[in-house]
A protein has these predicted regions:
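Short aromatic-enriched loop/helix-cap "lid" or pocket-rim segments at secondary-structure transitions
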Residues: 63-64, 90, 138-143
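Conserved helicase motor "Helicase C" RecA-like lobe of SF1/SF2 P-loop NTPases
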Residues: 3-53
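Hydrophobic/aromatic beta-strand patches that form the interior of the parallel beta-sheet core
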Residues: 50, 97, 128-130
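SF2 helicase motor core recognition
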Residues: 32, 62, 76-98, 104-122
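Conserved helicase ATPase core of P-loop NTP-dependent helicases/translocases
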Residues: 33-36, 45-80
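A conserved SF2-helicase RecA2
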Residues: 103-109, 116-163
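Interdomain linker/hinge connecting the two RecA-like lobes of the SF2 helicase core
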Residues: 1-20, 147-163
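A short beta-strand-to-loop transition that corresponds to the Sensor-1 phosphate-sensing loop
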Residues: 19-22, 79-82, 133
Length: 163
């Protein structure tokens, strides 16, 4: 079964994240709304798609996270900031979709930490990164990868250069 099939038929959760801090309902174009509309057109019921930004109180977050853990919400979209630390909805996560590249390698780890963690019912998960070749996206992903390598070398005291 393909991951796309799981969106339409299963109770597994897809998390879509980017570095945008807020959904702007007045904006002429919203990537979140565009993705939501395409998911609905593809057969995902609208009530199974949620934006983390709509959970703007602790009570609403608690309610949303409960729905996600029960499989009532199967597509959750939001920013790295809003879907980072403190979001424990890993129970049914099957896929993480990185819509953009953050500047800091730690933000990528934070995203990955939402899905690759103890308590997830899925033994196999998928992480998708969307990059347009020949654009700043490609350069940014390469830059973040190089930053991560540098940080790892410092943390492990393993340097590729002899001293």
């Amino acid at each position: 079964m393909a991951v796309g099939d799981k969106i339409v038929g299963g109770a597994d959760l897809h998390a879509l994240v980017d570095t945008l801090d807020d959904v702007k309902p007045d904006a002429p174009f919203s990537v979140y709304e565009d993705i939501r509309d395409k998911l609905i057109a593809g057969g995902v019921p609208a009530h199974e798609i949620a934006f983390i930004h709509d959970a703007n109180t602790d009570a609403r977050k608690k309610e949303l996270f409960s729905k996600v853990r029960r499989g009532q919400v199967r597509v959750l979209m939001g920013s790295t900031f809003k879907m980072g630390a403190g979001m424990n909805v890993q129970d049914r996560l099957i896929a993480l979709h990185d819509l953009d590249c953050p500047w800091r390698p730690g933000d990528l780890e934070q995203r990955k930490g939402r899905i690759v963690r103890q308590g997830n019912q899925n033994q196999e998960v998928h992480i998708y990164r969307y990059v347009t070749e020949g654009t700043f996206d490609s350069y940014l992903w390469q830059t973040v990868e190089n930053k991560q390598k540098f940080i790892s070398q410092i943390m492990t005291s393993k340097s590729p250069v002899r001293s």
